Amino acid sequence: MPSHTWNEVGLWGRSVRANTAAKNADLLAAQGKGFSYGPTHNLHMLLFAASYDGQGAVATQAGKDYRKYAGDAQFEATTLIRFGRFDEVLALNHRPDNGASAAIYDFAKGYAMLKSGDLAGAETTLKTLQGYIATTKDKIRFHPAKTVVGVLTHILAGEISVTQGDTEAALEAFTQAVSLEDALDYDEPEPLPFAARHWLGQTLLDAGQPSKAEAVFRDELKDHPHNGWSLHGLQQSLAARGMDDPAVNEDLQTSWARADIWLSGAKF
């Protein structure tokens, strides 16, 4: 699939087009026209690329289609979190039976609770996730579920700390999330449609540490080139110090040309 190459070099729009074509071929094959190869993989690739391209409608629909096809709502939930559609997460009622998928789904529910003002619900979810990663031997493909879900657990813990005004604890949690994310082996698409550095960088920026935020966003762009979430964070980190980089501005404008959302930060 050409989209594996497009993802690696940050040509997210091309990846979306390639995987849309693959998805459509799968639909035709279901009608006896042509053949199908890896329909769930195609949908996962589509939602992943669209998430980094800012195409929320495409990403979230691919997540829903994945759930309908595979009976697993984890990607439906995480793409909705990526695009800040918390009311839709709270309305979900398709908790997976698989332990690892259920934990990812629970993270999304807990995060949406927090963003909707239910701190107690988010804290209860956090305890559940902490219990899961302490004991699980599950796998998500070839990744230890405790590592993938560990990333999410620390993101939720950090966001709870942000809500409580404890920036130091939040930064510590997000740093731990980044460390776990960095420990994951190469996989494409990755298990999550977002990066822990989006939370770390944005929190550093909000805490008045734009130089550190800049470094985080530049590191993130090495992992996912030309993604608007990190480019916006980088642009704002520079602006906070009275700096402007035309190359960054142009990259953001080009990379975010197909996006259907307005960015207020690197994460919702």
Predicted segments with their positions:
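TPR/TPR-like (Sel1-like) alpha-helical repeat modules
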Residues: 7, 12-25, 51, 57, ...
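"A position-specific structural signal for the A-helix of alpha-solenoid helical repeats
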Residues: 1, 45, 75, 104, ...
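Start-of-helix signal in alpha-solenoid helical-repeat scaffolds, especially tetratricopeptide repeats
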Residues: 36-40, 70, 103, 144-151, ...
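Solenoid-like repeat scaffolds
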Residues: 23-33, 63-70, 92-101, 130-145, ...
